[in-house]
């Protein structure tokens, strides 16, 4: 899979931009605060209908305007797709091949992406919510039903929490009705996550072993707030534990267990990776990203698009080399950087773009080499 071109209207500091890409490597060079990250964010947004930097769509709108449009042409093994996202004060519209998509799960997955940004280094030591977000984005791209189940779960969870917060005399019969719905959706969310972690664990360990020069093994554990013995019993255990938590939940006025409380833990040679060195943690994240690429390819039969946002300067020469070696020739890759100094040997099939104050131009020197 690769994105052939993109058109931006009123996105961040871009009033208008139209860019044609190389199917292989695309490098965007410019000083800081010129729009390099904004541009990669637009590709990410076109794929996932969300930013990795903000929850507010208003922040994406150019200060002179009130609406945004991002369009792109994607080439997949199954054919060409036209993607279109429009944001306005009335809301958002998503289209595939000019047809409106009623549900998010109908749109997500049309173009798959893997993003590696400096903030990903917080995946090891950061808040559990970062790791849940990591799971939700990856699983959502390869399992469209997951997003619907997660949305339904969050809807019932909000109902349950609102009821607990606003009701003085809680009706446990009504609470049990909500428990049934929460267990239905939540057990499927946990099952999807559990399966994904098992597959990710195997693939990431292969990469980490190579990157660490065969000195370290990586393992990933899913930490569920629900105790269960096997996948077939998740719903039953979830429901029982929800019932047992009624008194605590009524007292605290929120739902104390469920996938919204779950986490993942990383281990390097059986030691919690939070105690690892910065270099070990960077190798871990690099292994995760390379594993994501392979998992998406396995499920969808198409390689995802790789977005590397200002991370090459965060990696030493060894890890840069392993990253570039790990990227298959048919993985379209986008790199942002302030210079080419810290990039290892580059392939011939690439395009280099200059980015300056919301304007993108082809690097003519490279184009004529």
Swiss-Prot record:
PROSITE patterns: RECF_1, RECF_2. GO terms for biological process: DNA replication; DNA synthesis involved in DNA repair; double-strand break repair; SOS response. ATP binds at residues 30-37. Transmembrane segments: none annotated. Keywords: ATP-binding, Cytoplasm, DNA damage, DNA repair, DNA replication, DNA-binding, Nucleotide-binding, SOS response. InterPro entries: DNA-binding_RecF, DNA-binding_RecF_CS, P-loop_NTPase, RecF/RecN/SMC_N, RecF_2. It is found in: Cytoplasm. Coiled coil: none annotated. Gene3D superfamilies: P-loop containing nucleotide triphosphate hydrolases (3.40.50.300), RecF/RecN/SMC, N-terminal domain (1.20.1050.90). GO terms for cellular component: cytoplasm. It comes from the Bacteria. One of its GO terms (molecular function) is single-stranded DNA binding. The keyword Nucleotide-binding applies. The RecF protein is involved in DNA metabolism; it is required for DNA replication and normal SOS inducibility. RecF binds preferentially to single-stranded, linear DNA. It also seems to bind ATP. Belongs to the RecF family. This is DNA replication and repair protein RecF. It comes from Streptococcus agalactiae serotype Ia (strain ATCC 27591 / A909 / CDC SS700). The gene is recF.
């Amino acid at each position: 899979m690769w994105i052939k071109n993109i058109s931006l209207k009123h996105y961040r500091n871009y009033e208008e931009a139209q860019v044609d890409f190389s199917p292989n490597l695309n490098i965007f060079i410019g000083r800081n605060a010129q729009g390099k990250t904004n541009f990669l964010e637009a590709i990410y947004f076109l794929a996932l209908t969300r930013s990795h930097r903000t929850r507010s769509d208003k922040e994406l709108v150019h200060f002179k305007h009130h609406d945004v449009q991002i369009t792109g042409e994607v080439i997949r093994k199954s054919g060409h797709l036209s993607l279109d996202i429009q944001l306005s004060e009335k809301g958002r519209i998503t289209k595939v091949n000019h047809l409106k998509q009623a549900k998010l799960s109908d749109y997500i997955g049309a173009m798959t992406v893997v993003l590696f940004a400096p903030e990903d280094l917080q995946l090891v030591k950061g808040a559990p919510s970062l790791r849940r977000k990591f799971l939700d984005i990856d699983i959502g791209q390869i399992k469209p039903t997951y997003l619907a189940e997660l949305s339904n779960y969050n809807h019932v969870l909000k109902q349950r929490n609102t009821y607990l917060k606003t009701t003085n005399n809680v009706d446990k019969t009504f609470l049990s009705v909500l428990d049934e719905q929460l267990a239905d959706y939540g057990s499927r969310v946990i099952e999807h996550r559990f399966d994904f972690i098992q597959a990710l664990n195997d693939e990431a360990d292969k990469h980490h072993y190579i990157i660490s020069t065969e000195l370290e093994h990586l393992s990933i554990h899913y930490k569920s707030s629900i105790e269960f013995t096997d996948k077939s019993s998740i719903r039953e255990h979830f429901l029982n534990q929800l019932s047992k938590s009624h008194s605590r939940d009524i007292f605290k006025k929120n739902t104390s267990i469920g996938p919204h409380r779950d986490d993942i833990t990383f281990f390097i040679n059986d030691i919690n990776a939070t105690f690892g060195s910065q270099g070990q943690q960077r190798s871990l994240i690099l292994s995760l990203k390379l594993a994501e690429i392979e998992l998406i390819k396995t499920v969808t039969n198409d390689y995802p698009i790789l977005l590397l946002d200002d991370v090459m300067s965060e990696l030493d020469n060894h890890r840069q080399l392993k990253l570039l070696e790990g990227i298959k020739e048919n993985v379209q890759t986008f790199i942002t950087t302030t210079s080419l100094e810290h990039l290892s040997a580059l392939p011939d099939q690439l395009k280099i773009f200059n980015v300056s104050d919301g304007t993108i131009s082809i690097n003519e020197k490279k184009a004529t080499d």
